[in-house]
From Swiss-Prot:
One of its GO terms (molecular function) is UMP kinase activity. This is Uridylate kinase. It comes from Lacticaseibacillus paracasei (strain ATCC 334 / BCRC 17002 / CCUG 31169 / CIP 107868 / KCTC 3260 / NRRL B-441) (Lactobacillus paracasei). Allosterically activated by GTP. Inhibited by UTP. One of its GO terms (cellular component) is cytoplasm.
Length: 239
């Protein structure tokens, strides 16, 4: 029995890099794919949004004096590279997967078409949304919120790299930091908790989409969240 039937899984680029912090670490992405396969076998419809921070970060562009829009487009291309790597790992484990990009590159992926994405999900295929929203100035967190609203997802799963939930402060720097079990999107905005940017939080709140923040590095955690086990922090869509 699962709590969520259709999910958007947000995976940061850094999570794919493991301890290396850069690039794609083969054992790490294989382990993530295995966790996704476990959830797929439950009959859950899975859409994924990948970040690109393991390949390109906006700060690098800023240091180079690059225009923000140009740097953002480079970040979008980085997410496509991550999506293709994850697709390959999933399919090698027997999970049918499609990549859809917000910027057309038909030789390697389908263009994003909402109805087609939903059809893939209904047929039991994992869909990876790459290329962000296709527009600069929008984060991949906002992409996750946007795609979740478009496909009617029950929840966004924010799979974090060695972070097991939302805290009142950085637990690595503040010994008095308190972990929250549940919050609302308005709490996130008012307390400035940096779970996701304000655009993504507002979009999730306006469309009544729940969010679960949890540690991706603990094997089996994606499955536990989908089954409704109390791990991480749950952020309710309603304010």
């Amino acid at each position: 029995m699962v709590k969520y039937n259709r999910i958007v899984l947000k995976i940061s680029g850094e999570a794919l890099a493991g301890e290396a912090g850069f690039g794609i670490k083969p054992p790490v992405i294989a382990t993530i794919a295995k966790q996704i396969k476990e959830v797929h076998e439950l009959g859950v419809q899975i859409a994924i949004v990948c970040g690109g921070g393991n390949i390109w970060r906006g700060e690098t562009g800023a240091e180079m004096g690059m225009e923000r829009a140009q740097a953002d487009y480079m970040g979008m291309l980085a997410t496509v590279m991550n999506a293709l790597a994850l697709q390959d790992n999933l399919e090698s484990q027997g999970v049918p997967t499609r990549v859809q990009t917000s910027i057309e590159m038909r030789q390697i992926a389908e263009p994003y078409i909402r109805r087609k994405a939903i059809r893939h999900l209904e047929k039991g295929r994992v869909v990876i949304f790459a290329g962000g929203t296709g527009n600069p100035y929008f984060s991949t967190d906002t992409t996750a919120a946007l795609r979740a609203a478009e496909i009617g997802a029950d929840v966004i799963l924010m799979a974090k790299n060695n972070v097991d939930g939302v805290y009142s402060a950085d637990p690595n720097k503040d010994t008095h930091a308190v972990k929250y079990e549940s919050l609302t999107h308005m709490d996130i905005i008012n307390k400035d908790l940096k779970v996701m940017d304000s655009t993504a939080s507002t979009l999730s709140m306006d469309n009544d989409i729940d969010l679960v923040v949890f540690n991706l590095n603990e094997p089996g955690n994606i499955k536990r969240v989908v089954e409704g086990q109390k791990i991480g922090t749950t952020i309710e869509g309603r304010s």
